[in-house]
Curated annotation (Swiss-Prot):
Matches recorded under SUPFAM superfamilies: Aldolase
GO molecular function: 3-deoxy-8-phosphooctulonate synthase activity
Biological source species: Neisseria meningitidis serogroup A / serotype 4A (strain DSM 15465 / Z2491)
Pathway(s) this gene product operates in, as recorded in its UniProt entry: Carbohydrate biosynthesis; 3-deoxy-D-manno-octulosonate biosynthesis; 3-deoxy-D-manno-octulosonate from D-ribulose 5-phosphate: step 2/3; Bacterial outer membrane biogenesis; lipopolysaccharide biosynthesis
Protein's name according to its UniProt entry: 2-dehydro-3-deoxyphosphooctonate aldolase
GO biological process: keto-3-deoxy-D-manno-octulosonic acid biosynthetic process
Family under the similarity heading: Belongs to the KdsA family.
Length: 280
């Protein structure tokens, strides 16, 4: 099943779409500079592109951690991104009252993994009629995503994307079950599946409120996931990850974006140049 996002068509058998940007909005200038680089690289490589960022990181481990610029300022920044670059935007919501104002500006609304079973939030998101990106919770099996999908269908919104972001593996660690991509496709009507590689690289350090990360393994993990014929890749970057206000250890250094995407596109082109081989 393919999904339209403005002039972009997203599907598991189509050339991959990049959902890329920064973890959280830090300022207007840094957002526009980062987005400009993404736009330049993706246009050069011929990759459909959707900008992503959060206006509020409502689930930070510490109450003292940076959360973002807030809803009102965030929507102003997203409007400027769309006006300057003419690209779609995706952001996440955390409470039902945020859904409609976000839907008026952003093209895709994201359901956070930790909130994916919250029925009131699902219903409010569905009512907007926007395309919805469902993050798979770390505690949920791929096949159980069908229950979340069914909630959206019951609320009359079938414009859905499924997003893998890793599964809990014991304490303080995430792993990605590569077989899970196929399971989500099979159990959820072949909805577009995308891979959030940078969040899948998160770790937790004992005694620390901040997330660690393994960005050195980002390319290996991204290639492994994209080899399963996915609709898109979800990627966060930062001009200087050491200075990022959230999830810097998992962020791809922005200057490596082009070389990173060249390799992803080469694999995606190869995989999708071949007919699907069904093994029963």
């Amino acid at each position: 099943m393919d999904i339209k996002i403005n002039d972009i068509t997203l599907g598991n058998n189509l050339p991959f779409v990049l959902f890329g940007g920064i973890n959280v909005l830090e300022s207007l200038d840094s957002t526009l500079q980062t987005c400009a680089h993404y736009v330049e690289v993706t246009r050069k490589l011929g990759i459909p592109y959707i900008f992503k960022a959060s206006f509020d990181k409502a689930n930070r481990s510490s109450i003292h951690s940076y959360r973002g610029v807030g809803l009102e300022e965030g929507l102003k920044i997203f409007e400027k991104v769309k006006a300057e670059f003419g690209i779609p935007v995706i952001t996440d919501v955390h409470e039902p009252h945020q859904c409609q104002p976000v839907a008026e500006v952003c093209d895709v609304i994201q359901l956070p993994a930790f909130l994916a079973r919250q029925t009131d939030l699902v219903a409010a998101m569905a009512e907007t009629g926007n395309v919805i990106n469902i993050k798979k919770p770390q505690f949920l099996s791929p096949s159980q995503m069908k229950n979340i999908v069914e909630k959206f269908h019951e609320a009359d919104n079938g414009k859905l994307i499924l997003c893998e972001r890793g599964s809990s593996f014991g304490y303080d660690n995430l792993v990605v079950d590569i077989l899970g991509f196929g399971v989500m496709k099979q159990t959820c009507g072949n909805l577009p599946v995308i891979f959030d590689v940078t969040h899948s690289l998160q770790t937790r350090d004992a005694g620390s409120a901040a997330s660690g990360g393994r960005r050195a393994q980002a390319l290996d993990l991204a290639l492994a996931g994209m080899a399963t014929r996915l609709a898109g890749l979800f990627l966060e970057s930062h001009p200087d990850p050491k200075l990022a206000k959230c999830d810097g250890p998992s962020a791809l250094p922005l200057h490596l974006l082009e070389d990173f995407l060249i390799r992803i596109k080469a694999l995606d082109d190869l995989i999708k140049s071949q007919p699907i081989l069904t093994i029963e």
